[in-house]
């Protein structure tokens, strides 16, 4: 199983540290890279603008995807050097950097020849755990080399780490790193030739297609109308976490909390209940949140947005980049019945997947003032389901690598929730503003949700009454 935690909680085993940095020659080539006509994706543009705005206000925004895993023995530096450089040269998401040429316009620069990209190893002497954590958290999205790779060599094993700007990747990078760095490295040190990989897709091509698709949208487009209707039912924007979160005008660092919802047997019984209701496990996840919110707030309709991967074609599935989109979900829960909630939640999720290709930012651009639409406010709620019991994530989750994912614990304005299904248990991880009011609210939400999972799995969930 892999774990999700904050970077400040990571205390690696003592050892010598070797980090791969962009070479001076590669940095010079990047600075000279010509302007590209390829636009940033909507995800990238939103991220860059948020980062710039946070910096202007003196705030430190989360911006990285950080991973570690352990391997036995001593690291073969030559083999690891090959694996890392091959990965960076293979994927065009690493070949660009961005700058603002005026208040809003973002310009992309692209290195023409992937062979010009090179990272070289450097040993860091006498670095403490705190210094290492700071070092790993340094990449920022307005630099080309917004990625770091390295190892910590202990007596009988080494820990590999990767710190990559979210600008370049999304959660699917987990499987990519496992194959292209871990498995490639293992093949090389085992005396085998480099793993043969199919041609990678181009994220640039996705950005061009996305720009053309979103440029063709109007307020009359069906996908836009559905977003407008969803936002109108949530005070003109995306849904807010239903319980108090404290004063969010004051910046708070993010706090991460993980709780077990069900063991393996309970998870199997819960899935059977979902299927009996005409849903899948994912529908049951949103149903439990909806019923928990009904218990806590007496609401009769549950609204939330969830993340999903928008890769669809075989080429896109081989493309590294930021493809994550949002799906709006609405679940009526007046009946208080799990079966009906799960069934409707599944329908809402499945029928809303095509909306993930329409960024909410684009809807805001198209919206007329009379629609009353506005950007998400602090405290918005994003809920995701991650199934690590099936491929490709099961390969990582079931390995003996001690695979870990880290959040930086920087300023957090929203509540992000991940329900994670593993082979032997189901957990929930929540990232939220670190203050006493938000902590109490999140704890109450998790407790209510866990109770519904357990009662559903045990077949003891009767019709729920508000406030019970």
Curated annotation (Swiss-Prot):
BP GO terms, sorted: cell wall organization; sulfolipid biosynthetic process
Effect the entry attributes to changing residue 166 to A: Loss of sulfolipid-1 (SL-1) production
Keyword Acyltransferase found: yes
First-tier enzyme category under EC: transferase
Domain of life: Bacteria
Pfam families given in the database record: Condensation
Keywords assigned by UniProt, alphabetized: Acyltransferase, Cell wall biogenesis/degradation, Lipid biosynthesis, Lipid metabolism, Transferase
Annotated signal peptide: none
Phenotype of null mutants: Null mutant does not produce SL-1. Disruption of the gene does not alter the virulence of M.tuberculosis in mice.
Outcome when changing residue 170 to A: Loss of sulfolipid-1 (SL-1) production
Catalytic activity annotation: 2-O-sulfo-alpha,alpha-trehalose + hexadecanoyl-CoA = 2-O-sulfo-2'-O-hexadecanoyl-alpha,alpha-trehalose + CoA
Listed EC numbers: 2.3.1.288
One GO MF term: acyltransferase activity, transferring groups other than amino-acyl groups
SUPFAM superfamilies: CoA-dependent acyltransferases
Protein family membership: Belongs to the PapA acyltransferase family.
Role noted for this protein: Required for the biosynthesis of sulfolipid-1 (SL-1), a major mycobacterial cell wall lipid. Catalyzes the acylation of trehalose-2-sulfate by adding the palmitoyl group at the 2'-position to yield the intermediate trehalose-2-sulfate-2'-palmitate (SL659).
Name of the featured protein: Trehalose-2-sulfate acyltransferase PapA2
